[in-house]
């Protein structure tokens, strides 16, 4: 999505940056993990296919993707984005008849970045961005039956189950943006690339 191609969103523990070509090799490494492929319902791609996908997502106005940087690693590694990459967060506008509904996805791929609240903060910041900049009024999420960490996280944020698919072995959850007032996202929007310490 072009609208976020020069935007960085800085939170307390994370920095969201647009998914750029330089991020592809690390992202591709993550997506070799059978566990991550299963949890994200993804297929293994060749490196060139991953580069093509990154370009496709950049130009697709129905997809908003940010790479999640671990802010502690960012500060410790001299602002090195690649060494600070922790995962990604996405919004997909799948319904052409209702562009106010977005499917949200989160992946914290780096094991050392899990269990520290980075996923929660990434979701809150992305939801805030979706509501304020992209006019989202409802979020949906599709999560595998066996993905307990994600199910727990989304439930804690107030997402509620609307359906369950035995065929796809997943649960679909929803969250109405008028409930977002009960949640907070401490975020600063900066121009990307970031020039100084965040």
Curated annotation (Swiss-Prot):
List the SUPFAM superfamilies: Acyl-CoA N-acyltransferases (Nat)
Sorted keywords for this record are: Acyltransferase, Transferase
- N-acetyltransferase domain segment(s): 14-186
Q: Which GO terms describe its molecular function?
A: N-acetyltransferase activity
What's the Enzyme Commission number for this chain? 2.3.1.-
Q: A single Pfam family, by name?
A: Acetyltransf_3
Note the superkingdom of the native organism.
Answer: Eukaryota
Coiled-coil region: none
Name the protein family: Belongs to the acetyltransferase family. GNAT subfamily.
Q: What protein name is recorded for this chain?
A: N-acetyltransferase 9-like protein
> Which gene does this sequence derive from?
nat9
């Amino acid at each position: 999505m072009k609208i976020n191609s020069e935007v960085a969103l800085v939170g307390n523990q994370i920095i969201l940056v647009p998914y750029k070509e330089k991020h592809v090799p690390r992202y591709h490494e993550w997506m070799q993990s059978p566990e991550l492929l299963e949890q994200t319902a993804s297929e293994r791609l060749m490196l060139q296919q991953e580069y093509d996908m990154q370009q496709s997502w950049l130009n697709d106005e129905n997809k908003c993707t940010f790479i999640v940087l671990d802010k502690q690693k960012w500060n410790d590694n001299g602002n090195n984005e690649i060494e600070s990459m922790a995962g990604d967060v996405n919004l997909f506008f799948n319904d052409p008849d209702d562009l106010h509904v977005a499917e949200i996805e989160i992946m914290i791929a780096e094991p050392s970045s899990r269990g520290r609240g980075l996923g929660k903060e990434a979701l809150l910041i992305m939801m805030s961005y979706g509501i304020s900049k992209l006019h989202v009024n409802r979020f949906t999420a599709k999560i595998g039956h066996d993905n307990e960490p994600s199910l727990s996280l989304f439930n804690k944020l107030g997402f509620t189950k609307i359906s369950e698919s035995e065929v796809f072995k997943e649960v679909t959850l929803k969250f109405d943006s008028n409930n977002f007032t009960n949640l907070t996202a401490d975020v600063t929007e900066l121009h990307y690339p970031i020039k100084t310490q965040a």
